[in-house]
């Protein structure tokens, strides 16, 4: 425990920026180490809700809400976006179903998100796919962190969107958060 100056936590965003600066790169979204990350929206044409997927696989599940961030644990090491070679793609090259793909330590992790309407309501789906890219069998674990961060960084804030966000309540129901 230490005493910090007021500027360390002047705003929630500054607090999280400063915490991220003191930890290993990759443990937090890229914008928390003041690096730009690009993103794409995901939604349905008639829906009022929309999600964002950034190039590292961070998924903001609804406008201005929390995000889901994947991590792999393999061979006693935590693998993050900062450890990986990252590419992006659209399903079949042109369908509006974006994916972010990591390649690191003999594994590939692909995060794919899409939305559709179910009974007239927009529903977001996300798939995490882990592939062993080596020759020998290996074990890996997927951790999906629910984070109080939007995909948009605070320097792209618009109408209250961008940066850290409050998570007021979480509920597990029928196998879903």
Region annotations inferred by a language model:
Residues 1-177:
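Terminal accessory carbohydrate-recognition/targeting modules of carbohydrate-active enzymes
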């Amino acid at each position: 425990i230490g005493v910090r100056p007021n500027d360390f936590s002047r705003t929630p965003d500054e607090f999280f920026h400063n915490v991220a600066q003191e930890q290993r790169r990759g443990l937090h979204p890229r914008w928390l180490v003041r690096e730009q990350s690009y993103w794409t929206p995901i939604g349905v044409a008639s829906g009022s809700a929309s999600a964002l997927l950034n190039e590292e696989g961070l998924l903001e599940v609804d406008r201005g809400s929390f995000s889901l961030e994947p991590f792999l644990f393999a061979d006693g090491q935590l693998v993050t976006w900062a450890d990986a070679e990252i590419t992006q793609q659209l399903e079949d090259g042109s369908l509006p179903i974006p994916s972010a793909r990591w390649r690191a330590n003999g594994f590939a992790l692909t995060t794919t998100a899409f939305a559709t309407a179910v009974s007239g309501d927009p529903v977001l789906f996300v798939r995490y796919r882990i592939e062993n890219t080596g020759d020998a069998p290996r074990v890996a674990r997927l951790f999906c962190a629910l984070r109080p961060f939007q995909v948009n960084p605070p320097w792209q804030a618009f109408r209250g969107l961008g940066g850290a966000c409050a998570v007021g309540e979480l509920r597990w129901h029928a196998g879903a958060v």
